[in-house]
C-alpha cells in the first residue's frame, strides 16, 4: 500500500506521528466504452466553450459561480494559503462512547500506521481507546477539504490498528421527509410476537467471509467465457486525424508529427514523409496561423530540408 497523507495525532501534550492509507478498494470489473459499429475506443476531450480548443488538465482552473452568475477563479495557490490546508495535524477534539456515533455519519475509512522509530505512543493511544471503549472525534485536512472524523481501534488478527473514518457534516445528511410515516399504524401483539420469532430464527453472529458479490463473480465468468470462446479482439490505436479547420499551430504540429510516426516502419510513400517533414518545419518557422502553401513553394522548401528524415526520403527516391 502507498500512504496518501502524513501527519500526527495530537491529544493533550502527546503527538503520535502516523501515515494514512486507504482502507478499502473497489473490486468491480471496469469496462471501456467502445463504438458499437467498429469496437473503437470512445475518447473524451476537455474542450473550452469559448475558444473551442482542447485544454490540457494542467491548464484547467477551478471557478465558483454565484447565484447571480458571477464567476471567480480559485487556484491551487489560493487554496494553499488557507490555514487549514497547511495543517498536518489530526487534532483530537473529544472522546465519546462508541455507541453514540451513528453509522449514518460514516463516509470513508483509512488505516493509520506509526511513522516513527518507536511505536510506543501509537500503541499507548490504541490500547487506551480499546480499554475505555471510546472513539476520538478528530479534525484534520485531507485532499483540500476540512474533515471531521472518528478515530478508533480495530483488531486485525491480534494486531490492534488505529483507523480513521471520515464523517459527514450534519448538513450533509438529508432529512427523510416521508409524510406517510406520520400516520399512526396499529400493530397487533400477535403480529409483533410472530415477527420477533422470525427475527430470532434468523439470528446469528456476523461472519463477513460468508458473503460474496455473486454478480461480480458471474460477470467475471462471463468475461472469461468470451475470452476463451474466441470473441476477444484488439483495436490498434489510431493516429489523430488532421483538422483543416483549426488555427492552433501547436495542435496542428502535434497531429502532423503523430501522422509521421504512424507512417514510419511500414510501407509508405516517401513523398508523403517528406511533405509531412517540410510542413512541420513551416509550422515551426511561421508565427501566423498555418495555411496551405502553394505546391511550388512546398517543393522548394523540401529541396532545402537538412533534417535526417528528409535525406532518407531523398535516398529512397534515387
Swiss-Prot record:
GO MF term list: double-stranded DNA binding
Residue ranges annotated for the Ku domain, each copy included: 10-193
A Pfam cross-reference name: Ku
UniProt note: phenotype after gene disruption: Not essential for growth in the absence of DNA damage. 500-fold less efficient for NHEJ on blunt-ended or 5'overhang DSBs, 4-fold less efficient in repair of 3'-overhang DSBs. The fidelity of DNA repair depends on the form of the DSB; for blunt-ends fidelity is very low, and no longer entails nucleotide insertion, for 5'-overhangs remains 50% faithful but with very little nucleotide insertion, for 3'-overhangs repair is fully faithful. 1000-fold decrease in viability when exposed to ionizing radiation in late and stationary phase; not exacerbated by a double ligD-ku deletion.
Single GO biological process annotation from the record: DNA recombination
Feature: compositional bias, Basic residues: 290-318
UniProt xrefs under InterPro entries: Ku70/Ku80_beta-barrel_dom, Prok_Ku, SPOC-like_C_dom_sf
Subunit and partners: Homodimer. Interacts with Sir2 and probably also with LigD; may form a trimeric complex during NHEJ.
Family assignment from sequence similarity: Belongs to the prokaryotic Ku family.
Identification of the protein by name: Non-homologous end joining protein Ku
Amino acid at each position: 500500500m502507498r500512504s496518501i497523507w502524513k501527519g500526527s495525532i495530537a491529544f493533550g501534550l502527546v503527538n503520535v506521528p502516523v501515515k494514512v492509507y486507504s482502507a478499502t478498494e473497489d473490486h468491480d470489473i471496469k469496462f471501456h466504452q467502445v463504438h458499437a459499429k467498429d469496437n473503437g475506443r470512445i475518447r473524451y476531450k476537455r474542450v473550452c466553450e469559448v475558444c473551442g480548443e482542447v485544454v490540457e488538465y494542467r491548464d484547467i482552473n477551478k471557478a465558483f459561480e454565484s447565484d447571480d452568475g458571477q464567476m471567480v477563479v480559485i487556484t491551487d495557490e489560493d487554496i494553499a494559503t488557507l490555514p487549514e490546508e497547511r495543517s498536518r495535524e489530526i487534532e483530537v477534539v473529544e472522546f465519546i462512547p462508541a455507541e453514540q456515533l451513528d453509522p449514518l455519519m460514516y463516509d470513508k475509512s483509512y488505516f493509520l500506521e506509526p511513522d516513527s522509530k518507536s511505536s510506543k505512543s501509537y500503541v499507548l493511544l490504541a490500547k487506551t481507546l480499546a480499554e475505555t471503549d471510546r472513539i476520538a472525534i478528530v479534525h484534520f485536512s485531507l485532499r483540500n477539504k476540512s474533515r471531521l472524523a472518528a478515530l478508533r481501534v480495530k483488531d486485525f488478527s491480534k494486531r490492534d490498528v488505529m483507523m480513521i473514518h471520515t464523517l459527514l457534516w450534519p448538513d450533509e445528511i438529508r432529512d427523510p421527509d416521508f409524510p406517510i410515516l406520520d400516520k399512526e399504524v396499529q400493530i397487533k401483539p400477535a403480529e409483533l410476537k410472530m415477527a420477533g420469532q422470525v427475527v430470532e430464527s434468523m439470528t446469528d453472529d456476523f461472519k463477513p467471509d460468508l458473503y460474496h458479490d455473486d454478480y461480480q463473480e458471474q460477470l467475471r465468468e462471463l468475461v472469461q467465457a468470451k475470452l476463451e470462446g474466441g470473441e476477444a479482439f484488439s483495436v490498434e490505436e489510431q493516429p489523430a486525424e488532421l483538422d483543416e479547420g483549426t488555427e492552433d499551430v501547436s495542435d496542428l504540429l502535434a497531429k502532423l508529427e503523430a501522422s509521421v510516426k504512424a507512417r514510419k516502419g511500414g510501407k509508405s510513400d516517401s513523398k508523403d514523409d517528406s511533405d509531412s517533414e517540410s510542413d512541420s518545419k513551416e509550422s515551426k518557422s511561421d508565427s501566423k496561423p498555418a495555411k496551405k502553401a502553394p505546391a511550388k513553394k512546398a517543393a522548394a522548401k523540401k529541396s532545402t530540408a537538412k533534417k535526417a528524415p528528409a535525406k532518407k526520403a531523398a535516398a529512397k527516391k534515387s
